[in-house]
């Protein structure tokens, strides 16, 4: 399960801002919002059939999307193992910052042309493991960097299907392990 807490609009967009939080409808009985269905289609390309359900809402913010997640895993796991695995993933940045404005500001001040290219920024103190099989937490989505990196990776995969991982390593110096 996950909840997408979306920004109202991008800071560069003059319209579309909302005055207060707005909840989204569940259009699918199986998936909830389209986000879980989109993720399910993506995972199916890797022959993974996951039980996903999502809800969505917009907030009156222009900074970053927030994702609340609740994952149930088959094998027992500890919080330390979750932290270690997240920290080992070069596309994941960890942070103690609990406001999107602070993470956005870090990206503006230190990121490549003001952008964070990591796929996600996990807020460490929100991570929780319950009953050794349920992982819960929050993460922020660096929207611009996320779409830029995904587009580059997709292009490289199309051009170099057997070597795209090697090709995108030139960007690794632009990823952050800690924000």
Go through each PLM region and give its residues.
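A contiguous active-site-proximal alpha/beta segment in oxidoreductase catalytic domains
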Residues: 1
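C-terminal substrate-binding/catalytic lobe of Rossmann-fold NAD(P)-dependent oxidoreductases
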Residues: 4-139, 143
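NAD(P)-dependent Rossmann-like dehydrogenase/reductase catalytic/cofactor-binding core
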Residues: 114-179
């Amino acid at each position: 399960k996950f909840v997408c807490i979306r920004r109202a609009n991008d800071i560069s967009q003059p319209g579309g801002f909302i005055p207060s939080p707005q909840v989204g409808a569940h259009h699918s009985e199986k998936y909830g919002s389209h986000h879980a269905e989109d993720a399910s289609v993506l995972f199916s390309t890797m022959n993974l059939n996951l039980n996903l359900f999502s809800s969505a809402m917009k907030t009156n913010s222009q900074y970053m999307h927030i994702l609340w997640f609740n994952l149930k895993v088959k094998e027992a796991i500890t919080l330390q193992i979750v932290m270690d695995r997240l920290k080992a993933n070069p596309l994941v940045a960890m942070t103690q910052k609990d406001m999107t404005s602070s993470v956005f500001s870090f990206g503006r001040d230190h990121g490549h042309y003001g952008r964070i290219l990591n796929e996600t920024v996990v807020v460490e103190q929100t991570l929780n493991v319950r009953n050794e099989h349920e992982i819960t937490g929050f993460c922020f989505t660096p929207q611009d960097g996320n779409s830029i990196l995904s587009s580059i990776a997709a292009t490289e995969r199309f051009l170099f299907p057997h070597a795209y991982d090697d090709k995108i390593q030139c960007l690794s110096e632009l990823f952050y392990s800690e924000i």
